[in-house]
Amino acid sequence: MWYQGAGAGFDLPYQQNMDLHHGGRRRSSGPGIAGAGGVPLMHFQPTHASVEDNMREAVHMLDLLLPDQRKGFLRLFHQFAQQRQRPAIDWAQVKPLPPELVVQQSDVPACPNDQALRHELLDKVVILKLNGGLGTTMGCVWPKSAIEVRSDLSFLDLTVRQVEYLNSMYGVDIPLVLLNSFKTHEVTAKIIRKYRMHNLTIHTFMQSCHPRIIKDTLQPMPSCPFGESPPNEWYPPGHGDIYQALYASGLLENLINQGKEYIFISNVDNLGATVDLDLLYHIVDGEVDFAVEAIQRTRADLSGGILVGYKGKPKLVELSMVPPERRDDFKKTHNLFNTNNIWANLRSVQRMVAKDEMSLDVTVRERQVNGIRTLQLETLAGSAVRCFDRVLAVAVERARYLPVKSTSDLFLVQSDLYGVRHGTLVMSKDRLDKSVPLIKLGREFSFVEEFLRRIPHGVPNITELDHLTVAGDVIFGANVSLKGTVIIVANEGSVIMIPDGTVLRDSVVTGNLRILDH
């Protein structure tokens, strides 16, 4: 099979512009000079006009962005400016999602066992993985998708195996699309070369790149375009940018012309996000424009989006957006937690973007960069649920949400709790309770290198584990089994080495290896 994307002989991705928009246009290069007309930066000062006018003037005079991206950035800034004047959400209007918009996965009818029908369904599908993040939270400087998860296989390796299996099993050509950011694009282009001879087509494209905003002045941080200013003065504006980026890249039209009708979007680190034929059949049969998979929120789901009803429409609300005084009541009332597994009709997306009707809620995040407080304006892919007419929330089983955000999650997915079949993680039949154990590893385990050093013989047996907390300098031996609730705490300056063959059940282990009933 062939594949397209970044690299020699590939499609031009949206925002290869990372190179083209600063290398393919003339720039003034003298000191203190940037942008259209060679406007001296030192002479540019915000006026007393509105913050929007000042930002628009700065972006144009400094020539920071190409037209498409400039429009997108200024749209987000406009929404941000409005939110400063009045609350973005009238909390009195927030209601539970109407029952008619929610279907339980257990109530979804099975896809008929008809090979021709399944071929027809899968031939309409595109799989897209959000691949814009680095593995920095786990001490890695490369794309998170390249981290090895199971048996020397990375997130990307597992995804490729899943797609290859479907292609071979049903005689289809499901394209795999990777949405990269400027942080992951070049490395990903090199990584995917190893899949040249595999049975799938890979497309890559890159999302937008926006300038950080100085919080005190509400002016752009960079004084010249990307590539001519430090990379940390720029940021990818969230995965809600996917729709505009896919449209602008030309890939959306290309996929539609190939006869593709639905796109399945998910985070590359969610090992539970696989194509489910029953869900696909239900969505296609119901002519759904946009569907979001959600789970029942638990105490472990500390951040993310919640699906609610708002002024008669579905809406995705980030927990961080909820005022502190309302948070407890909000969590008690609303518990449909967004998995970021999304099914969307490609023609509906194309129509909404073309008509400029894909207006997504803005999330404001604050970051410290070089000692300066900055803002970044982001959107979420799931917030598009409010833009479509025929929408659906699918309350899915927890197995469809298995993200790896930390080494605690890595501990879980590398354990004997799961096996791998055709690139998909499958829970062990030895696990009687199908709930997932709660794993809390201390800071000593935070980075992958240290994590692996502390489990040199692999993750302990945890098929009967309910809860594990580890704090301090702890190293696990071979063939260790953890059952029930286990707490291991090494005091500062102490080392706990769990001996080979140890079985801990409902135990607390302290610095001197005393084992107590818990």
Where in this protein do the model-derived segments appear?
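Left-handed beta-helix
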Residues: 2-123, 281-518
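Domain-scale recognition of functional cores that engage charged ligands
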Residues: 100-126, 137-384, 396, 424
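ATP phosphate-binding P-loop of adenylate-forming
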Residues: 127-133
